[in-house]
Amino acid sequence: MDERLILEAGRVKDGLRVLVTGGGSGIGASVVDALRSAGAKVFVCDIDPSTSPDHVADISQGQQVEEMFRAIERDLGGLDVLVNNVGIAGPAGLVDEIDPNDFDEVLRVNLSGTFRVTACAVPLLRTADSGLIVNIASTAGIFPYPYRSPYVAAKWAIVGLGRSWAMELGEDNIRVNVICPGSVGGPRMDQVIQKEAQAKGVGEAEIRSGYETQVSMRRFMDAADVAGAVVYMASPAGRHVSGQVLSVDGATESLRSS
């Protein structure tokens, strides 16, 4: 056993060049902080300029994505790791209550945006010593969530993309994994609960309790829990981990299926 791999599970190669989309807040910001603490050089993309990203971009717009990658090549000189984190929650409601335009927006950002970014990143990752793509999906990409069908559709697709890319890109020494977070506490989850409560005509406390009881630990996760999984995958200890869908969810999946 190479004990160095165990010791290095929380460290990455010094100067590892990483792009994190949606890195200005929430899970993305936690991933950025963790990777920087682990020794990486991180380029942050976000649509919100108030979060002070390295580059402001809407990843659903092809020209903006191309401009972002020109900035990455200028600032980093290449790329070793891509973390596809951008995602919007979208609407909540029954299928006949959701505006098709809102459905399209969720797919345009969460799915097409991820595809655009990855298509631009892969040529750079091929020139790295060892490339890595991490798709941040959701437990909504593993099993259904009523009233959240646009988001569920996008996240199931993100999981499928990740598993397919792992098979496509292995010969190029590019690993691809998917992380499926459970319910992460914070403003984003508060908005989800509010929308779902309105759609169902019940109180927010009831919705919140429902989410919490789906977790074996009976509490929401912290974004740092997801960030730790990303660091592991980017570390030497994760060098042969590819094609995996990792649930970081407090056993939400097993409780829902029991």
Predicted regions and their residues:
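C-terminal helical subdomain
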Residues: 2-3, 178, 186, 202-237, ...
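Short, small/polar-rich loop/turn modules that mediate ligand/substrate recognition or access, typified
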Residues: 170, 175, 241-243
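Active-site helix of classical SDR
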Residues: 118, 154, 162
